[in-house]
Amino acid sequence: ADFNASYIQLLGSLMGGMVAKHASSEIAAEWVPKVISGDVVIGLGLTEPRGGSDAANLQLKAEKFGNGWRLSGEKTSMSFADQADAAVVFARTSNPEGGSRGVSAFFVDLTEKGISRTHFDDIGTKPVGRGSVFFDDVYVPAENMMAEQDRAFGSIMAGFDFSRALIGLECLGAAQASVDETWAYVQDRE
C-alpha cells in the first residue's frame, strides 16, 4: 500500500474544499473544477521555519499595498511546494505578538513574480514532494483574500478536523498492508 496514492486525493479534497468555501466565487469557479479534474494542484502555505507545532505563530507578513496586499516571508515543509499551481497562503496581517488573531489567508497563483521554490529530498513523500516557497514582495489582489481579514486561521483550519482523521486512516491502512505482507511471508517461508 502506498500512502502517497491516497494522500494526493486527500490534499485535493482539502484544498478544493477550502477554496470552494472561503475564496471568492470567481476564484472558486475558475479553480475548483480544475482541482476536481486533476488539471491543477493547490498547495497549503502554512508551516514556517520557526513555527513547529504552533501553526498560528506566523512570520510571513501581508502588508496593504494599493488595491491589494504584498506578501513577504517563507513557507516550509509545504506539500507540492515545487509542483503546485497555486496555494492558500496564511500570513500575518496584524497582531505582531502572534496567535491566531491577526492571521489572514490568501489565494496565491504560484507563478507570480517574486515567488521562488525549493524541493526537499524527502524519502517519505516523493510523489507528493515537499519544499519551501519564498515570497519576496509578492502582490496579491484584495479579492484573493479568503475568509475574514485577521480571523481566517480558525475558520479555515476547521477543515483540517476531517482531514486529520483521514490521515490517521491512511496510516492505519499502510500499516495493515505491511502486517498482511509480513504474515503472508511468514506463512510461506521455509
Range-by-range predicted roles:
Residues 31, 58, 74-76, 118-121:
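Short beta-alpha junctions and helix-cap segments that line functional grooves
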Residues 38-46:
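A short, Trp-centered hydrophobic/proline-enriched beta-strand micro-motif
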Residues 60-63:
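A structural signal for short hydrophobic beta-strand segments in well-ordered beta-sheet cores
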Residues 72-118:
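A short core secondary-structure module
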